[in-house]
């Protein structure tokens, strides 16, 4: 009997009776839409993402099994619903809630989210403006904000997809200045809406299209001496940090991140930040999913 009591005591220490674990993931699913594309060596116009790629993406999601999945590069709502339906039919646990945010009118790639947790509120911020070469421009994909409540604790997720490195401007190589200004504008919006001194609890996820030590990432981490976010150290099974493979130049880079506010960081489960590197993952997308667990 004494042995049983001791065993129960240690189990309660290891697995808190009243805790709730939430897995949050971010995944750029690479052109999950209709577009002109190369398929099996042939150029196809207005062609959907091949089913073999879709199947691999579903397989990655099933294996990670996130409770909340932030998506980038999803097409119109039809494609989100298609993915949503297929995932729910696979028996991994129903995603009961979804959210889709439309970007600019001519933007094909949008933000979306699937969740097993109830969504308390959801907002799309499409009017984030900034000055770029003396012209006021908007973030093309906007910023998604979703609010959750777990074990009585209210927290928020922001999903973003910053400007890619493709540009026609020779005076802004790789759109570095544009991306920095877009990041700064989003940072300022979050900071203004949820001031650091109020100890906001949130996570910022997505495809930042830049490296760890670049200005767009730094904008989200700190202002002067005020820490805004911590970058979670997502790694794959071999300990590598890269999340994106660029086949044209055969390069591997870290472009996808999970950034948590100091208050959110208290719920992060140490060592749970991972990169999904399962077999054939790059056949579904050129990005690898990043995810982490939180205990509330």
Briefly describe each language-model feature range.
Residues 138, 188-203, 209-296:
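Metal-dependent phosphoester-hydrolase catalytic domains
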């Amino acid at each position: 009997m004494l042995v049983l009591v001791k065993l129960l005591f240690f189990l309660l220490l290891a697995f808190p009776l009243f805790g709730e674990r939430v897995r949050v993931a971010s995944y750029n699913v690479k052109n999950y839409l209709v577009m002109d594309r190369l398929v099996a060596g042939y150029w196809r116009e207005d062609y959907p993402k091949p089913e073999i790629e879709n199947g691999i993406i579903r397989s990655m999601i099933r294996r990670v099994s996130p409770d909340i999945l932030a998506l980038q590069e999803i097409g119109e709502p039809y494609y989100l619903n298609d993915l949503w339906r297929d995932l729910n039919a696979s028996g991994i646990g129903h995603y009961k809630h979804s959210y889709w945010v439309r970007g600019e009118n001519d933007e094909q790639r949008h933000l979306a989210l699937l969740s097993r947790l109830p969504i308390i509120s959801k907002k799309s911020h499409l009017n984030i403006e900034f000055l770029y070469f003396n012209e006021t421009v908007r973030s093309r994909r906007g910023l998604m904000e979703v609010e959750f409540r777990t074990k009585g604790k209210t927290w928020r997720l922001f999903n973003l997809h910053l400007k890619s490195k493709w540009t026609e401007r020779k005076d802004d190589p790789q759109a570095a200045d544009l991306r920095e200004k877009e990041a700064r504008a989003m940072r300022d919006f979050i900071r203004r809406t949820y001031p650091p001194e109020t100890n906001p609890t949130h996570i910022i996820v997505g495809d930042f299209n830049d490296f760890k030590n670049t200005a767009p990432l730094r904008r989200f981490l700190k202002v002067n001496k005020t820490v805004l976010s911590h970058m979670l150290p997502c790694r794959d099974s071999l300990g590598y940090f890269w999340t994106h493979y660029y086949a044209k130049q055969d390069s591997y880079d870290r472009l996808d991140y999970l950034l948590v506010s100091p208050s959110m960081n208290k719920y992060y489960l140490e060592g749970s930040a991972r990169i999904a590197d399962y077999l054939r993952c790059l056949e579904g997308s050129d990005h690898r999913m990043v995810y982490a667990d939180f205990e509330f």
